[in-house]
């Protein structure tokens, strides 16, 4: 049995223990004798090592009093530091590990779980400024799910990542305003719903904490979709919080479980309306700040159905369509009552939380595309891993032929060449692997990055609205690549050839064209694959570069062909994710003269190539990022204040903007590319930089104040001036100062290049020509198509005066 005894020479033992990696080790002295290094240990030993209860004091004044196991602190104990900080709780293997309470020098207190000296698991932190966080921790930071309460009464409850609000969550301010939104790095980012204390509300999109894009504003008394109402029954009749008076309590851990189990379960029903007013704050996680988190919240449920107004009670002018750019209101108009009261309009508003996912949803286990995604990832990982070790060389004619294929069978249990997997058995075919390997190299796409982007630990995202053809689109998690399925609905009628075969037929000339012209705007293809399932079902995929892979928000998207027949979108079908068409375009874009010349020079070359392949139906995909003029940002706070009172910004903010001439209205700056500072380069872009007249015909970078610095290349990060086209010519001439103009950043490229002008298209042209103007329909001769296409774009990008 271990016993108490005195050891007069423990220097060797002390050094051995410390050399084992322990910074808290012990030797024993009895009756106050001191070790040669000045430390003191009094306690129980097992042989020559501390074991059992004991107390160790360091020369700097730190003290541990607790249990030991084979020279390591293990079990319950108390440690006090000279600074005044202390910890009491569980230890394991010499580390703070388990449940315990830490008290900081600044008065902050953490009570909860630990792992390896870091907060990990469930715990509550009361910071020195009286802020509190209650929830889950990971590696010392709030993570996963929790509730943060500021000292002034503001509350956030929802998801966290690495100490910041990240994911779905609800923020409620002390004045009663509530924001139910997605969050990113501590800022509102994504689709959200804001309910003001006045009764007004706004449904729209936030970008890095600012309203951005289209939304709907409801004044007090207007009809609000029923499932958006926050019930007043959360506040009792005497004005106190129902959550504080309820006998039923629910912990943060159970809230987390409920949210995971119930996708439509709303956190905001657990937030009550406070009574006093205070400004909002943003949490900062360090030793000197934090949040006051309630130990529990009310589980009292409610129904908001009885609060919805009848249609007859609604003023048609009490609902407004709005558009914001970086928090600045640039458009407001009464919402069209027909679209608002239509079945599709009501369904769209009532399903705002489904829209919150954006135009895509992450593929999860149980999703209809889950096994297809696993098969695709397994196949790409196998192919890229097989082709990458082969020395890079120029492609040969046989690299395009029918034998240029990689085939493999993937059984669930695995084989000599394939790993076991959790999907279904399938056959894999990869087309022209050496050609696409060279194309990826051409665009500086590293093989490892390519696999991680598509086949990494994260799932792919499926676009919620497939195209007319029935194809389904997937995005890699980093959104660098688009994966499109090629279905039988895209067969060439009569010839019965898949679009895939069209691509493979034109691949040799496509390869030469892309190699010859660095700045080509044509779609970049990086792989073609086929999956065959056991019943014989075949799914073909093509991997392409994503034109809109940018951290900037794309406010408008247009698909421009140059034809007019059927080239408009019904207003009731338009939302912020809609890709608009030719007749919907109400802007022209002025770009720098050298950029315009380079742009149309490349468009002409690309159209010449497509014409040589008898390709039609291609289009220019145009993405627009609007920049808010600096002088308009100064009235943002005014607009936000008006919203909280439910007053229309169109009514109250109709005053003229008188700003100093010294304040620039530019939403961006151009700087020389050789100036110091990192610039973000477009994904899978290899073309040379374009030269700007404004920059003295030198290569330039685009600087967006408050956002970053971007490399300007043809079709990527291109700054321009957008001018709204006025229908009334006289207004345009006489009131040029009132013309709407915006600084914009453009992204563009030519897509849908896999439709030949074949027999079916000739028949389509003949039939439609009987009813419509032959020049207005899309199906025309390739030569006419390319000339009409370029002519239309010249009007979209006119020469500057």
UniProtKB/Swiss-Prot annotation:
CC annotations in GO: plasma membrane
CDD domains: PIPKc_AtPIP5K_like
EC code(s) of this entry: 2.7.1.68
Top-level taxon in the UniProt lineage: Eukaryota
Domain PIPK: 366-797
Record keywords: ATP-binding, Developmental protein, Differentiation, Flowering, Kinase, Nucleotide-binding, Repeat, Signal, Transferase
Tissue expression per record: Expressed in young seedlings, shoot and seeds, and at lower level in roots, stem and leaf.
Regulation: induction: By auxin, abscisic acid, cytokinins, gibberellic acid, Ca(2+), methyl jasmonate and salicylic acid.
PANTHER family tied to this protein: PHOSPHATIDYLINOSITOL 4-PHOSPHATE 5-KINASE 8, PHOSPHATIDYLINOSITOL-4-PHOSPHATE 5-KINASE
Gene Ontology molecular function terms on file: 1-phosphatidylinositol-4-phosphate 5-kinase activity; ATP binding
Role according to the record: Involved in flowering. May suppress floral initiation by modifying the expression of genes related to floral induction.
InterPro entries registered for this protein in UniProt: MORN, PIno-4-P-5_kinase_pln, PInositol-4-P-4/5-kinase_C_sf, PInositol-4-P-4/5-kinase_core, PInositol-4-P-5-kinase_N, PInositol-4/5-P-5/4-kinase
Note: Transgenic plants suppressing PIPK1 show earlier heading (7 to 14 days earlier), delayed leaf development (a common phenotype observed with earlier flowering), and greater expression of floral induction genes.
Signal peptide (residue range): 1-21
Swiss-Prot/TrEMBL MORN repeat ranges: 41-63, 64-86, 87-109, 110-132, 133-155, 156-178, 182-201, 202-223
GO biological process, one term: phosphatidylinositol phosphate biosynthetic process
A Pfam family hit: PIP5K
Catalytic activity line of the entry: a 1,2-diacyl-sn-glycero-3-phospho-(1D-myo-inositol 4-phosphate) + ATP = a 1,2-diacyl-sn-glycero-3-phospho-(1D-myo-inositol-4,5-bisphosphate) + ADP + H(+)
Protein name, UniProt field: Phosphatidylinositol 4-phosphate 5-kinase 1
EC supergroup of this enzyme: transferase
Keyword Nucleus: no
């Amino acid at each position: 049995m271990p016993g108490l005894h005195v050891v007069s020479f423990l220097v060797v033992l002390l050094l051995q223990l410390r050399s084992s990696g322990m910074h808290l080790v012990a030797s024993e002295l009895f009756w106050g004798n001191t070790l040669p290094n000045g430390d003191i240990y009094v306690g129980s030993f097992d042989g020559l090592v501390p074991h059992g209860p004991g107390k160790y004091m360091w020369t700097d004044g730190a003290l541990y009093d607790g249990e030991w196991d084979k020279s390591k602190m293990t079990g319950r104990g108390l440690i006090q530091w000279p600074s005044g900080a202390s910890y009491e709780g569980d230890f394991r293997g010499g580390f703070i590990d388990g449940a315990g309470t830490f008290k900081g020098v600044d008065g902050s207190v953490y009570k909860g779980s630990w792992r390896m000296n870091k907060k990990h698991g469930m715990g509550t932190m009361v910071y020195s400024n009286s802020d509190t966080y209650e929830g889950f921790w990971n590696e010392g930071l709030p993570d996963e799910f929790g509730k943060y309460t500021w000292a002034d009464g503001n509350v956030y409850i929802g998801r966290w990542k690495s100490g910041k609000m990240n994911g779905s969550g609800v923020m409620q301010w002390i004045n009663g305003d509530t924001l139910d939104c997605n969050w990113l790095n501590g800022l509102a980012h994504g689709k959200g719903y804001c309910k003001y204390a006045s009764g007004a509300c706004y449904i729209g999109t936030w970008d890095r904490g600012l309203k951005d894009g289209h939304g709907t504003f409801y004044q007090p008394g207007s009809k609000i979709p029923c499932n958006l109402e926050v019930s007043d029954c959360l506040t009792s009749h005497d004005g106190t919080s129902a959550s504080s008076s309820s006998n039923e309590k629910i912990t943060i851990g159970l809230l987390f479980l409920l949210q995971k189990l119930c996708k439509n379960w709303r956190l905001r029903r657990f937030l009550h309306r406070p009574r006093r007013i205070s400004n909002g704050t943003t949490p900062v996680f360090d030793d000197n700040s934090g949040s006051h988190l309630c130990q529990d919240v009310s589980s009292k449920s409610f129904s908001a159905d009885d609060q919805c107004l009848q249609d007859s009670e609604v003023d048609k002018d009490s609902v407004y369509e709005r558009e914001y750019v970086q928090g600045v209101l640039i458009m407001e108009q009464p919402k069209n009552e027909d679209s608002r009261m239509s079945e599709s309009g009501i369904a769209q508003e009532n399903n705002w939380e489904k829209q919150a996912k954006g135009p895509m949803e992450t593929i999860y286990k149980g999703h209809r595309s889950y096994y297809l995604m696993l098969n695709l990832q397994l196949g790409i990982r196998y192919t890229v891993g097989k082709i990458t070790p082969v020395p890079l060389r120029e492609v040969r004619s046989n690299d395009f032929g029918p034998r240029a294929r990689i085939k493999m069978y993937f059984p669930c249990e695995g084989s000599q060449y394939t790993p076991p997997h959790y999907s279904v058995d399938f056959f894999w075919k990869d087309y022209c692997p050496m050609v696409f390997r060279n194309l990826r190299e051409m665009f500086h796409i590293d093989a490892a990055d390519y696999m991680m982007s598509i086949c990494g630990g994260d799932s792919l995202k499926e676009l919620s609205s497939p195209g007319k053809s029935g194809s389904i689109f997937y995005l890699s998690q980093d959104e660098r690549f688009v994966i499109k399925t090629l279905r039988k609905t895209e067969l060439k009628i009569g010839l019965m050839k898949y679009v895939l075969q069209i691509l493979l037929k034109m691949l040799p000339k496509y390869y030469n064209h892309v190699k010859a012209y660095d700045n080509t705007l044509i779609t970049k293809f990086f792989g073609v694959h086929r999956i065959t399932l056991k019943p014989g079902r075949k799914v073909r995929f093509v991997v392409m570069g994503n034109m809109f892979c940018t951290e900037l928000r794309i406010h408008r998207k247009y698909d421009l062909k140059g034809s007019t027949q059927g080239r408009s979108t019904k207003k009731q079908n338009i939302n912020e994710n809609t890709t608009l068409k030719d007749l919907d375009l109400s802007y022209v874009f002025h770009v720098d003269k050298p950029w315009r010349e380079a742009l149309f020079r490349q468009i002409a070359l690309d159209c010449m190539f497509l014409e040589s392949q008898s390709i039609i139906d291609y289009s220019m995909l145009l993405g627009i990022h609007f920049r808010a003029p600096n002088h308009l940002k100064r009235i943002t706070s005014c607009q936000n204040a008006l919203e909280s009172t439910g007053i229309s910004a169109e009514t109250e903010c109709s005053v003229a903007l008188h700003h100093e001439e010294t304040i620039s209205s530019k939403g961006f700056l151009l700087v020389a590319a050789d100036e110091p500072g990192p610039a973000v380069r477009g994904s899978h872009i290899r073309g040379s930089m374009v030269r700007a007249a404004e920059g003295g015909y030198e290569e330039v970078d685009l600087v967006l104040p408050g956002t970053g610095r971007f490399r300007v290349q043809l079709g990527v990060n291109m700054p321009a001036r957008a001018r709204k086209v006025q229908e009334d010519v006289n207004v345009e001439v006489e009131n040029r100062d009132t013309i709407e103009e915006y600084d914009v950043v453009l992204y563009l490229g030519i897509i849908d290049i896999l439709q030949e002008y074949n027999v079916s298209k000739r028949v389509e042209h003949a039939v439609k020509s009987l009813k419509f103007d032959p020049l207005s329909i899309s199906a025309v001769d390739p030569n006419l198509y390319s000339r009409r296409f370029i002519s239309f774009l010249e009007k979209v990008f006119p020469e500057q005066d």
